C-alpha cells in the first residue's frame, strides 16, 4: 500500500488497483507510520564528498503554504544519502538534528553546498566548509545588477564572465599520481580567478553598481570551496545543488498527486518515505522486513506455473 501511494496518484491507485480506501485513510496510514523515528543511525562524514540542504514550498491544510526542507549527503561514489526531511522546521533545529547523527566531532574536508537560502550561511560549519552553488551564484548576480538598473543585455557579459571564472574543471583520476604541473595549472586558474573577481568588484563600485558589488563580495569567498578542498585532499566534490533539486522535483511531483493539504507530520513522513525508497533501497527493504518480522531463514523459489485451459473461451 505505501509503495503504491508513493508511486502513483490517488485516483489511479483506487481505479487501477481496486483498492477501497479513502484519501483520509491513506493519510492516517502515513501519519501513523514510525518512519519519522527510524533511520536515525550515525552518519560518517568520512564517507561523503558533500552535504546539501534546501527548502521548497508545499500546499497544506486550508490553503496554507508550508516549507519542506531536506538535507542530503553525496557519497564519494556520487550517490545520494538521505539525511533528513522536515516540514515547517527552523534551520537551527534541523542543524541540531543532523549534528546528533554525525559521528565526527571536528571539521572535515567536505563542502556544505547551498543556494543562498537565508539561515544556511553557517549551517554545519563545525564539520563542513560552506560552498555556494555556482549555478545559483551567477544567477543571483544577474538579479543584483538588475536592482542596479542594468538590463539583461548589459549584465549578461558580467554574469558570463563569472560563470567562466568559477567554471574551473578538475582533472579526473587518482590525485596522488597526477603530474605536479596539472595540479599547478588548477592552482594557477584558481588564484587568477579570485584576483579577477576582486577586480570585478572594484569595477562595479566605480560604476556605481552597489548591489552587484555587495553581492559579489559576499559571494566571492564561497565559490571556490570545492577547488580548495581538491588542492588539499584530492577529493572531487560537487559544486552545485542539482542533485538536491532533482530530489525536490521527485518529492514535489508525488506530494501534488497524493499529499496536498496534509499536516506537517504527514508531509514529513511521506517525503522521508520517498527519499529512502528512491535513494536507499537496501534500508527501505530492511525496514519492511523488520516491520513484517521477516528473518530471511529460507527462500521461496517458484520453479514453474501451469495454468489449466478455460472451457468458457
Which residues does each PLM region occupy?
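RNase H-like nuclease fold core
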Residues: 3-12, 16-123, 219-227, 243-244
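Acidic/histidine-rich catalytic cores and adjacent linkers
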Residues: 103-131, 156-313
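Short, surface-exposed amphipathic charged segments that create phosphate/polyanion-binding patches used
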Residues: 65-68, 144-156
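A generic structural signal for short coil/turn motifs at secondary-structure boundaries
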Residues: 59-62, 137, 260
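Contiguous, well-ordered alpha-helical segments that form the cores/surfaces of helical PPI scaffolds
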Residues: 1-3, 249
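Residues on a specific face of well-ordered alpha-helices
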Residues: 24, 28, 118, 136-139, ...
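Inter-helix linker motif
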Residues: 127-149
Amino acid at each position: 500500500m505505501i509503495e503504491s501511494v508513493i508511486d502513483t496518484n490517488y485516483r489511479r491507485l483506487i481505479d487501477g488497483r481496486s483498492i477501497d480506501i479513502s484519501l483520509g485513510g491513506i493519510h492516517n496510514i502515513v501519519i501513523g507510520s514510525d518512519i519519522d523515528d527510524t533511520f536515525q543511525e550515525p552518519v560518517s562524514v568520512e564517507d561523503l564528498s558533500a552535504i546539501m540542504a534546501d527548502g521548497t514550498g508545499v500546499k497544506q491544510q486550508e490553503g496554507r503554504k508550508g516549507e519542506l526542507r531536506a538535507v542530503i549527503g553525496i557519497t564519494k561514489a556520487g550517490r545520494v544519502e538521505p539525511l533528513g526531511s522536515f516540514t515547517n522546521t527552523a534551520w537551527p533545529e534541523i542543524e541540531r538534528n543532523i549534528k546528533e547523527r554525525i559521528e565526527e566531532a571536528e571539521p572535515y574536508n567536505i563542502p556544505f553546498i547551498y543556494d543562498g537560502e537565508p539561515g544556511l550561511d553557517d549551517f554545519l560549519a563545525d564539520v563542513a566548509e560552506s560552498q555556494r552553488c555556482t549555478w545559483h551564484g551567477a544567477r543571483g548576480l544577474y538579479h543584483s545588477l538588475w536592482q542596479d538598473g542594468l538590463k539583461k543585455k548589459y549584465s549578461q557579459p558580467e554574469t558570463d564572465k563569472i560563470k567562466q571564472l568559477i567554471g574551473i574543471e578538475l582533472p579526473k583520476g587518482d590525485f596522488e599520481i597526477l603530474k605536479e604541473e596539472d595540479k599547478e595549472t588548477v592552482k594557477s586558474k584558481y588564484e587568477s580567478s579570485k584576483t579577477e573577481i576582486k577586480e570585478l568588484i572594484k569595477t562595479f563600485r566605480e560604476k556605481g553598481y552597489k548591489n552587484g558589488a555587495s553581492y559579489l563580495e559576499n559571494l566571492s569567498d564561497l565559490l571556490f570551496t570545492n577547488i580548495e578542498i581538491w588542492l588539499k585532499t584530492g577529493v572531487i566534490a560537487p559544486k552545485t545543488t542539482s542533485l538536491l533539486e532533482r530530489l525536490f522535483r521527485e518529492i514535489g511531483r508525488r506530494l501534488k498527486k497524493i499529499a496536498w493539504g496534509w499536516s506537517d507530520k504527514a508531509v514529513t513522513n511521506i517525503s522521508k518515505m520517498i527519499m529512502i525508497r528512491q535513494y536507499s533501497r537496501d534500508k527501505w527493504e530492511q525496514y519492511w522486513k523488520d516491520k513484517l518480522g521477516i528473518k530471511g531463514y529460507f527462500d521461496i523459489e517458484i520453479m514453474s506455473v501451469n495454468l489449466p485451459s478455460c472451457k468458457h473461451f
